[in-house]
């Protein structure tokens, strides 16, 4: 059964704090195992990569078989049904349109002293996209990661995807082509992350690694950060639904289960001021669970990490939502916009009963790569900005240096950095 909390209970604060602190991540020896793999690939390159692929994916290759060929991609596209390809194309187009609006603008201006200042944006040269394999192979995630990179101007986009027993999801390859991926390699796990970061004879290193994966992939991304950039450390998926008594219990239950079916560690939460709705949603969840193909996963998620939180009024939901900082926030109330405007922390917000989070997963246009595990308190979802760098620009002439130089020299001396002061003083004939 899910956790039931009531804001009016005397022990609510204690129970809510415990609920927030409950760990949903796989831990134990994952980091040590990932470190061993990353270090091995860094040392031995392709040899270590091929050994790990044989061990974990039961796929024996030589280095020439790592890259997925153009012929394989073409065959995969032909194997996909037309309706699904059309849906992927629609998703790609909407994602591209949305992300083009995020492109930042360069700036250059002159201040009252005549100093020229500004900044400019440039795309990173290369990015690596990690795509999970097996049952968690999601072509939509390929588009969500690849399209913003291409919009930003990344010229080399490398995809790695595990191929258990040699099998690749044709839709993943089709999405890679639609998204503008330039290279695809049939490797996964911590070993693929290591190859993208350190490079091997076959796979050239990239500047940044993005994309979700299991606990070993997440640990490997932590380990290579600094050598390369990373997007975020993705945890189990989560949704928070805030609803009043106008909410449709069947719809809300379906949305809660849409997250629960992802992973046994996924989290689905309802906050409501309606006791009737809370009871109806709980009944609807139990009924719908019986009809889901992934009922075992969804049932475990709902039982272990689900929650229904009662509040006296929806004003009480606001600080709770900010504390939860959910990856996905759905608001099904009479005035969802007004409530959303008062909530600070959420990865993405879905307004109104006709905006299920699943639309955002696929064809809404906004990105579904979002901060989890309360990291929406300080971070944002994937965007064009993740694939770009901002460089500041400064230009002084003789007059501007004379106006600003003495103050800079004073600060240099105050910090004990005499060479700093001298580099200015020589230009002003003061050193």
Curated annotation (Swiss-Prot):
Binding site for NAD(+): 130, 191, 214
Pathway: Amino-acid biosynthesis; L-histidine biosynthesis; L-histidine from 5-phospho-alpha-D-ribose 1-diphosphate: step 9/9
CDD domains the UniProt entry points to: Histidinol_dh
Cofactor dependency: Zn(2+)
EC number: 1.1.1.23
Alphabetical keyword list: Amino-acid biosynthesis, Histidine biosynthesis, Metal-binding, NAD, Oxidoreductase, Zinc
GO biological process: L-histidine biosynthetic process
Keyword Acetylation: no
Coiled-coil regions, chain positions: none
Active site, UniProt feature: 327-328
Enzyme class: oxidoreductase
Function as written in the Swiss-Prot or TrEMBL entry: Catalyzes the sequential NAD-dependent oxidations of L-histidinol to L-histidinaldehyde and then to L-histidine.
Protein name: Histidinol dehydrogenase
